[in-house]
Amino acid sequence: MSEVNLKGRKVTVHDMCLRDGMHAKREQMSIEQMVTIATALDEAGVPYIQVTHGAGLGGNSLQHGFAPHSNEAYLAAVCGAVKQTKVSVLLLPGLGTMRELQSAYDCGARSVHVATHCTEADTSPQHIAFARKLGMDSTGFLMMAHLNTPEGLAQQGKLMESYGAQTVYITDSAGYMLPGDVKARVSALRDVLKPETEIGFHGHHNMGMGIANSIAAIEAGASRIDASVGGLGAGAGNTPLEAFVAVCERMGIETGCDLFKLMDMAEDIIFPIMDHIVRVDRSSLTLGFAGVYSTFLLHTNRVSQRFGIPARDILVELGRKKMIGGQEDMIIDTAMTMAKERGLLKDATAGVAP
């Protein structure tokens, strides 16, 4: 797979089960499930785990869905249960607030991904600076990275670094990129960032490229990799952590994780709680192929049934329109327009929930 000798390379793994995995669970995860998963990850030697609503701090909303518990309740329970693992949170400026970040810190979170669209790093300076003030491990998280050029992403990453980000992430939110795309973007970042600023990669498995793309990122200089046990996450899931760690062991890349414990955890804990099999299927593959935000999958499946338009057709149109995270309302708008054009919808209000 790799033309570069990566033997001895150290990589910090960040598990996404308890945040990105919330999307696959329609935000319906109990505190008991959270604690069980977090404890197993801790015992397997995973250094970082992310815990919030799928949309991050402030995510409980009509648009993003309501979890049965607050972020604070989840965080307090998980932070109180783990011994070695550090707990992180996701924060999207404009959705999550600095007050909520302070609350997360008070609950025990010590790391944060401050996430923006790949062209909007300039919305993050206050949140990154506040995270640094709290003493948190602070990451700038550039989402939908395929929609910006390597050079453009490098400049966005440089901005985040200037605000205080200690790590900058290339985030393949759509699972669209191929290894060459990842290498080009990570290399461009590495060329402009300070040597001490780390680079991370967050992949989705929509085209089955999560592991290959993560290895490509490491080849180009990334030292932090997001993944999820069992691939539990939006779309076809995140890079499956246990498979990624197995590949790393074969290549001599050091993760510090216990492979067999992760394998057992995927089989015994994660797979049984899945509401549906998180895999590459017709719809999730279309997400990757069309470059659509991975969290749109379940929303689109529901809208497809309501309007009688194949989910694949809706996703392709959303990709053509370059819709991004936060524009979930456009799924309904797009499906309604397509239904009208196909003569499936006479009444402009038909199919709209009261």
Swiss-Prot record:
The keyword Repressor does not apply. It comes from Dechloromonas aromatica (strain RCB). The record marks 19 as: Transition state stabilizer. This is 4-hydroxy-2-oxovalerate aldolase 5. The lineage of its organism: Bacteria, Pseudomonadati, Pseudomonadota, Betaproteobacteria, Rhodocyclales. It is an enzyme of class 4 (lyase). Substrate binds at residues 19-20, 173, 202, 293. Mn(2+) binds at residues 20, 202, 204. Belongs to the 4-hydroxy-2-oxovalerate aldolase family. Its EC number is 4.1.3.39.
